[in-house]
Regions:
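Terminal-appendage/accessory-domain detector
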Residues: 1-103, 200, 204-214, 221-464
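Hydrophobic face of alpha-helices
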Residues: 28, 32, 36, 109, ...
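Function-dense linear segments that define catalytic or interfacial modules
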Residues: 80-126, 134-138, 142
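Short connector loops/turns at beta-strand edges and beta->alpha or beta->beta junctions
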Residues: 89, 108-110, 115-117, 138, ...
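Short helix-coil transition sites and intra-membrane helix breaks within transmembrane domains
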Residues: 101-106, 155-160, 275
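Short amphipathic alpha-helical face segments that pack within enzyme cores
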Residues: 107-115, 161, 165-169, 280-285, ...
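Glycine-rich, mobile lid/loop segments that gate access to catalytic sites or pores
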Residues: 117-218, 225, 230-241
């Protein structure tokens, strides 16, 4: 009788067998765009006050100088650089999102992939791209069938799923065989987790997605030495991954079906606004409304009602005092207010000064977010859909429907928008525009880079 292979076995065989030549050109192109966006987010994140605290504390724990910290002239241990750079990507609500998995893949894996490759020194651009493809793809596959289930269970999606993607990359770098990779995954699964509640007010929200990928480095290094892990880490009915994180609800075919032919990472979208992704269709709809109705001023608006999913309504932070930038980025009323009053919801709209702006605080009172049964029952790819009702003081009501946020695979960035966002963010850490152009050129041609360290130097304060 032929034994059915576990998810772990199938993923491990895929990880070991994948070659750069096997990856379709459009997948590589999309991955490069996602990573460029991640690098921009990370460079900007390095300038934030919470990352300064995190960097200081982690660097005090070690004297090792194995990998660079982006946007600085500092080096630290590979695990320290992984956690710091990964957290920097997530530090201002600007990073990528996989729609179905509800994970921010870059913050979960790119810090790890880059730091480990830099530590090894001899990794080529093609080897880096192969490992990065595995990191993003495996993370998305693990998350794709259970995004809503993990969130409803109260866990952080990215911190729960991305340790497996990071493990795929580190195992690839180390040349582990399928058996060793299987055990590396089974070890790293013990680092999966993070609480959903962390995202609403605390600075800790920034660090949870990346810290769990420490398990990837530990797991792969241990497995290389013969250490064993949970072989059926995904399916085990007594505390396996899907038992714990999604109440054993998952689609095995979505996780490991058609490996190497169907690419889940193509479902990764980018953010155009500096807020929780679930607010982006609202922002897009309101911006479109103001553009189409230039005669209507913020003062003319009596009320805005946003119809959305129950989970988005639950976490809209309505009727709450906004005490932190983190909370503002999660607050639907705040996001609506700055969009109407200032025309955008980018980095300039989320400052300590803005949190105390009386115009913004007053306008927030006009916003109500309600759960909508129709939207609740839409297919998962349409879960960002919103219906917006805008009532003006003269009695008119406007109805807006927005389905795909800017940056979603169905509503992608133009090349100009991608580069604009990168330069806006990275430029806060690296003021030399010619170096920003060099980063873009090198990143978009990573397959030609002989040693990945030639690229990572560009991400530091001093550059190459």
């Amino acid at each position: 009788m032929k034994m059915v292979k576990t998810i772990n076995e199938q993923l491990s065989e895929f990880i070991v067998g994948l070659r750069y030549e096997d990856i379709p050109k459009d997948v590589i192109a999309h991955l490069k765009d996602v990573m460029l966006d991640n690098f921009g987010c990370g460079l900007f994140g390095s300038t934030t006050p919470w990352m300064a605290i995190y960097r200081k504390v982690l660097m005090e724990r070690t004297d090792r100088k194995e990998a660079s910290i982006w946007g600085t002239d500092l080096k630290t241990s590979v695990t320290g650089a992984m956690m710091i750079n990964g957290a920097s990507i997530n530090s201002f609500e600007l990073d990528d999102t996989h729609t179905d998995g509800i994970i921010h893949v870059g913050t979960g894996v790119l810090g790890c992939v880059t730091a480990f490759a830099e530590m090894l020194e001899s990794v080529s651009g093609r080897e880096f791209l192969t490992a990065a493809t595995l990191a993003y793809e495996v993370s998305c596959r693990v998350a794709a069938p259970v995004g809503m289930e993990i969130a409803h269970q109260g866990f952080n999606n990215t911190g729960s799923c991305c340790p497996f993607g990071s493990t795929a990359a580190v195992s690839k770098f180390l040349g582990l065989d399928a058996e060793q990779t299987k055990h590396a995954m089974g070890i790293a699964g013990n680092w999966a987790g993070g609480l959903q509640a962390v995202q609403f007010t605390s600075m800790a929200k920034r660090i949870v997605p990346s810290r769990s990928s420490e398990g990837a480095i530990v797991g792969a290094l241990l497995a290389k030495e013969g250490f064993t892990g949970i072989e059926d880490v995904f399916e085990n009915e007594f505390g396996g991954f899907y038992h714990c994180f999604s109440n054993h609800i998952y689609d095995k075919e979505r996780v490991c079906g058609d490996l190497g032919n169907r690419w889940e990472l193509m479902g990764i979208g980018l953010k155009y606004y500096s807020t929780c992704r679930s607010k982006h269709t609202t922002i897009g709809g309101l911006r479109r409304f103001m553009k189409e109705n230039p005669d209507i001023t913020p003062e003319d608006i009596e009320k805005i009602t946003v119809h959305t999913t129950s989970i988005t309504q639950k976490y809209a932070l309505q009727n709450q005092e906004i005490k932190s930038v983190t909370a503002a980025q999660l607050s639907h009323p705040y996001v609506c207010a700055v969009t109407i009053l200032e025309g955008n919801a980018f980095i300039e709209q989320f400052t300590e000064e803005k949190l105390r702006d009386p115009k913004i605080l007053d306008f927030m009172k006009k916003v109500e977010v309600v759960a909508d049964e129709e939207i609740e029952n839409l297919p998962r790819p349409l879960r960002y859909t919103v219906k917006i009702d805008i009532l003006t003081k003269d009695g008119r009501t406007f109805h807006i429907r927005e389905e795909y946020p800017k940056g979603h695979p169905k509503n992608p960035f133009t090349r100009k928008e991608l580069l604009w966002k990168f330069k806006q963010l990275a430029g806060k850490a690296i003021s030399d525009e010619s170096r920003l152009d060099r980063i873009i050129e090198a990143e978009q041609n990573l397959e030609d880079v002989e040693r990945i360290t030639d690229f990572t130097k560009l991400l530091t304060k001093q550059g190459a």
